[in-house]
Regions:
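Extended substrate/RNA-proximal surfaces in nucleic-acid metabolism proteins
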Residues: 54, 61-166
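An N-terminally biased module of ancient metal coordination in phosphate/nucleic-acid-related enzymes
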Residues: 1-93, 98, 164-166
């Protein structure tokens, strides 16, 4: 597909099999991005957390090194696309240092995406897609998104509209 616009073709939000709801390996996605004339492709699987919480939609912490290596291989294999290392992360205040110091710092992630799959409400984490069915829950969701943005850890928020929950 020819891009006649002055706006570059980019994708900053993508998932591989590691998210448990997608398929494919990083290099396959980047090759497809190249074939579609994308200039920039951000690989952004759901973040692993050191305590492996919410394992049904994210990779385990022990998979993190393999994930980073898969992105590095794709960067070398498809040099015509700028491949960025990222993760889509729940904002869990107790893991701010992990996100800032380990992912953005030590492991040199290019950026992080904020995610609102889970919402803290009265001491528990509710699924944002199935449990936000009353005003107090929605208020908690909005407050949590605001805290996420105020943390300045994330470049943008993925699907803040909690799609699929109407």
């Amino acid at each position: 597909m020819k891009n006649n616009s002055q706006i570059p073709l980019v994708n900053y939000h993508s998932h591989t099999y590691r998210c448990k709801h997608a398929f494919g390996e990083v290099v396959e996605f980047v090759k497809a991005a190249s074939e579609a004339d994308l200039e920039i492709f951000g690989v952004s699987d759901h973040a692993a957390f050191p305590d492996d919480r919410w394992p049904d939609i994210r990779m385990r912490y022990e998979e993190l090194d393999n994930y980073i290596e898969a992105v590095r291989v794709a960067q070398l294999s498809v040099p015509q696309v700028k491949v960025l290392l990222s993760m889509e992360c729940e904002y869990v205040p107790e893991f701010e240092n992990y996100l800032q110091d380990e992912l953005l710092g030590e492991r040199q992630f290019d950026y992080l995406i904020g995610a609102g799959h889970y919402t803290p409400h009265n001491g528990e984490w509710l699924s944002s897609f199935t449990k936000l069915n009353c005003k107090p829950h929605l208020k908690s969701y909005v407050e949590h998104l605001c805290q996420m943005m105020e943390s300045k850890l994330f470049e943008f928020i993925a699907h803040p509209d909690i799609f699929g929950s109407t």
